[in-house]
Regions:
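Active-site loops and adjacent core secondary-structure elements that bind or stabilize anionic groups
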Residues: 1-134, 139
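Compositionally biased, low-complexity/repeat regions
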Residues: 56-68, 154-254, 259-267
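Conserved mixed alpha/beta catalytic, RNA-binding, or beta-rich assembly cores of soluble enzyme
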Residues: 118, 124-160, 237-238
Length: 273
């Protein structure tokens, strides 16, 4: 298990400004508008150096898959996954993240990375008396949490896990996801169930970097990211899409969660009747 503290200046190069502009409604707007906002953002960012930091926790676990489940720590921890019920394109398989972990029947132990990243909680409260500065700080914090995940993933591939020690990718290449493996985050298209954060918390104790979970598995500070890291060379991102009542019930049973509660967690992923 690793807990890492980063200076703001270490993370700044990894920020994907396209998403920052999108958050401000500047996608497709003139470059001058974007550059003006970015200059203001950088001034704020640089004022945080030394006083505030970003944080990461990473754990590397022995893992094997069995059906749509990933088993960790010698089959002590079950991490159920969801499978596409409608492939993205005709002839494509219905994907599940468990597909990218060696099956238990192979007799070969695989590995799975589990992580979380966040920012100093004080940053989200620092500018509450000024709506504009508060929005600037919040959107910057969101980008910092994502950029910290990007830098952590680079370090994991090259050295911590070390499955791609000779990787030489620019940050732009990394933003284009040209690396080996994937880093799906909780709440994103292939992992929509926020309550999966309770399993992640059980494994890596997110409280050690100040992350707390709500009853639905949402994280505070808001500017936090959690998820999984897969090393399989053919692992790829995909969108789960909508699932039927049959898979909902099966998944709830595997998670040990009442079906009604799981319906709440997966509301946006359920096929509408």
């Amino acid at each position: 298990m690793r807990r890492i503290v980063y200076n703001i200046s270490e993370i700044e190069p990894y920020i994907n400004w396209l998403y920052f502009y999108h958050a401000w409604g500047l996608s497709g707007k003139p470059r001058a508008e974007k550059e003006k906002l970015k200059a203001e953002a950088l001034d704020m960012l640089h004022s945080w150096e030394g006083e505030y930091h970003t944080y990461a926790v990473f754990g590397l676990f022995e893992a094997n898959s069995e059906g749509d489940d990933i088993w960790l720590e010698g089959q002590k921890v079950r991490f159920p996954m969801l499978r596409q019920q409608h492939p993205a394109a005709q002839g494509e398989p219905n994907l599940c993240l468990a597909d990218f972990i060696r099956p238990l029947s192979s007799g070969i132990t695989d590995r799975l990375g589990i992580f979380c990243t966040t920012v100093d909680g004080g940053l989200e409260k620092k500018y509450r008396s000024d709506d504009y500065l508060n929005m600037m700080a919040q959107t910057l914090c969101d980008r910092l949490a994502e950029a910290t995940a990007e830098k952590l993933h680079e370090e994991v591939r090259r050295s911590i896990w070390g499955y791609a020690p000779d990787e030489q990718l620019s940050i732009e290449d990394q933003h284009q996801e040209r690396y080996q493996g994937i880093r799906p985050a909780i709440g994103y298209p292939s992992l929509p169930d926020t309550s999966a954060n309770f399993i992640i918390d059980q494994l890596i104790d997110m409280s050690q970097v100040g992350i707390r979970l709500t009853t639905s598995g949402m994280m505070t500070p808001h500017a936090s990211v959690s998820g999984l890291m897969f090393a399989h060379p053919k692992a790829r991102y995909f969108e789960l899409g909508q699932i039927g009542d049959d898979q909902l019930r099966d998944y709830a049973q595997r998670r040990g969660v009442p079906v009604q509660a799981m319906k709440t967690y997966l509301q946006s992923s359920l096929i509408k009747k």
